């Protein structure tokens, strides 16, 4: 294992986003090879796109799932959010189920070892919506976040980036090496942006 400095990273996600799902898979891998703690934070792509009439959210709304995640964190903590997010991702991206379906959320809760009744409780509690939006707009204000995955170092108080956008997900030491390089880059005061035009160069 690398002797890298311990880090706490705030990982902002929307459970409807496949890129955030892959990055979450990666950051879980990083935890196995680097001294990293992950704080799971909420970001609403629906809120970002609410004025865009070209976006059809009917089959892919994530607001109910985010509200359930907020109540789960309040009652059971960060580790339970991790488990539920993983279960929701399995439903959405492995089994191609819609997170707007109440039964899908309840099954994910059960798979995460949580009470399926938390879905109805979260949607009956208006403060869960407030909590999601408060967290969403806090990172928008802090670093002008616009999408997910968004990573912010120092438990959400330090420098941040949009990304990484990765496919396939690196494993083992390769995951750790990507983390090392990203953290180094994020902590460079002059760094602003980097973007790859395509996965592989044309020959």
How would you describe each model-predicted region?
Residues 15, 21-105, 181-185, 193-203:
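Structural alpha/beta surface segment adjacent to cysteine/selenocysteine redox centers
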Residues 1-4, 19:
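Basic, Lys/Arg-rich alpha-helical nucleic-acid-recognition elements, primarily the DNA-binding modules
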Residues 13, 54-55, 91, 118, ...:
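Residues at structural and domain junctions
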């Amino acid at each position: 294992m690398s002797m890298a400095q311990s880090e706490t990273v705030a990982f902002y996600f929307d459970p409807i986003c496949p890129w955030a799902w892959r990055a979450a898979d990666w950051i879980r891998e990083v935890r196995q090879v680097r001294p990293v703690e992950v704080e799971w934070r909420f970001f609403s792509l629906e809120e970002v796109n609410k004025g865009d009439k070209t976006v059809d959210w009917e089959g892919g709304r994530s607001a109910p799932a985010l509200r359930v995640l907020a109540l789960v964190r309040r009652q059971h903590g960060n580790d339970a959010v991790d488990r539920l997010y993983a279960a929701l991702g399995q439903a959405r991206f492995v089994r191609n189920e819609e997170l707007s379906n109440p039964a899908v959320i309840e099954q994910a809760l059960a798979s995460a070892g949580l009470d399926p009744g938390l879905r109805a409780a979260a949607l009956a509690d208006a403060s869960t919506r407030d909590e999601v939006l408060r967290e969403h707009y806090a990172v928008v204000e802090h670093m002008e976040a616009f999408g997910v995955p968004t990573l912010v170092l120092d438990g959400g108080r330090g420098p941040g980036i949009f990304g990484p956008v990765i496919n396939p997900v690196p494993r083992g030491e390769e995951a750790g090496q990507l983390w090392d390089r990203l953290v180094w880059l994020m902590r460079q005061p002059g760094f602003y942006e980097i973007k790859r035009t395509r996965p592989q160069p044309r020959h």
